[in-house]
Amino acid sequence: MKIFDYEDIQLIPNKCIVESRSECDTTIQFGPKKFKLPVVPANMQTVMNEKLAKWFAENDYFYIMHRFDEEARIPFIKHMQNSGLFASISVGVKKAEFDFIEKLAQEKLIPEYITIDIAHGHSDSVINMIKHIKTHIPDSFVIAGNVGTPEGVRELENAGADATKVGIGPGRVCITKIKTGFGTGGWQLAALNICSKAARKPLIADGGIRTHGDIAKSIRFGASMVMIGSLFAAHEESPGETVELDGKQYKEYFGSASEFQKGEHKNVEGKKMFVEHKGSLTDTLKEMQQDLQSSISYAGGKDLKSLRTVDYVIVRNSIFNGDRD
C-alpha cells in the first residue's frame, strides 16, 4: 500500500484545452442538489452557524449545520425550508438522537441532508442510526462518518449511507493521533485513496486540507466533496471571538472534541488555537473557485471529472517555492 499525504503529491499536467480557466466548471451534483464548489465548511461551532448556513444555501454552496445546539435544530429546519432553502443538519448517536429522528418523522420535517457526526464512525451505533434514519425518513440524504478504512466505507454504505466521511484526526485542531495513537493524520490522502477503491457512493474527504491545491488532490484520490475547517475559520463572517494579539486580529478555532466544545476536560481529542483574521469569506470562496478552475485547466479538462484521471508523482519533502519565505 502506498502511503502519502497532501504535501507528498504533485499532480502531472495534461494538455490544456480551454482558452481561459473561467471556462472550467467547478460545480458538483451531491445528493439532491447541485453546488458551485465541491467543498463544505466543517460542521464546527467556530466555522458554521445558522446565519452562515443560510448564506451558503442562498448562494448555492453546500453546508452542514453542527449538532451542538440540539434544541435549535427543528426551528432551523423549519426556517430554512420556509425560506425555500435546503436543510442540512448533524446528529449524534445517543438515545435522545434516535428519538429526535422519530420526532422529525412525526412532524413530517424532512431535512434534505443529515450527517451522522462521530469521531469513530465505523461502529455499531452509527450503523444503527443509519438504519433508523432510513426507516423513518428515507428521503433524507444520509452522510455518515468518520472512517479511515475500506471496511468502514463498505459497512456504512451497506447499512444505507448515501455518502461517507473519511478522516480520523488529520485536522489542525485535532489531537486524536497524539492522545490515542490512532488515525489518518500524516497519511490522510492515502487513506482516502484506499477507501475510494471500496466506495460505490460519494466520499467526503475530511481534514488535513491546508491549501487550495489540496482540494484538487482530494478529488484525484476519490473525494466528491472536501470538508474544510481551518481554511474557512477566522473570516469576518465566521463565528468565534475576535481577539487582538501583538496588534493583529485573530479568531478562535477549536475542535469538536476539545474541552472548549465539550465544556469539560473529558475524552478530549481536540485543541483550541487562534487563526489570523482572513477578511471576507466571499473573497476566499472566489479564490478557491479560481484556483480549482486552474487545476482543471492543468488537468486538461473542462470540469471536475478531469481531475480524477491525472497522473501524479510522490515527492517526499518537496522543495517549496513561492509559498514559504
Swiss-Prot record:
**Family annotation (CDD domains):** IMPDH
Query: What PROSITE patterns does UniProt report for this protein, alphabetically?
Result: IMP_DH_GMP_RED
Which catalytic residues are annotated?
174 (thioimidate intermediate)
Which SMART domains does the entry link to? Answer: IMPDH
Positions annotated to bind NADP(+): 203-226
**Entry keywords, A to Z:** NADP, Oxidoreductase
Role summary? Catalyzes the irreversible NADPH-dependent deamination of GMP to IMP. It functions in the conversion of nucleobase, nucleoside and nucleotide derivatives of G to A nucleotides, and in maintaining the intracellular balance of A and G nucleotides.
Q: What family, per the record?
A: Belongs to the IMPDH/GMPR family. GuaC type 2 subfamily.
Entry protein name = GMP reductase
- Record the organism: Staphylococcus aureus (strain MRSA252)
